[in-house]
């Protein structure tokens, strides 16, 4: 029986959420070209994949003291909600609230940069789909800290192990937890 990690890695292939093109490659948000493209938005559209992400994240966060989790719009919304729902179903004492960090504050309504159930002093875990350069995680961490949240951990579905992303995030005092690495995806067929 394959482990949950192996099942999730295979799920990337089954859902066509992992693309590999050695000749043409894919342009990443950083502008660099990579032979791999990881599309967690497609992955998270599948209930069976969300169940695996929820299970693995819940296990990975067992020892982390936290009140809430969230990250940058749009990708982090389904990830945070999935983890929160799975954790609560597994243990009703784990009522992790969720939030989303907007890319920019709204120019109407309350003009918030962060939406969700947060309070200054809350211990927050920042979630993201893929870690490459660390730029989106660092932006979410900075915004969360500016809102008074205490951020000591980040969780990503896939660490691409490129551009020193993990090192950059951990230099800001944030421990990175990854459910999978790019090696898991390239070796799962």
At which residue positions do the language-model features occur?
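PRPP-dependent phosphoribosyltransferase catalytic core
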Residues: 2-14, 142-189
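Short helix-loop-beta connector
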Residues: 62-67, 119-121
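Short glycine-rich phosphate-binding loop at a beta-alpha junction
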Residues: 66-75, 155-156
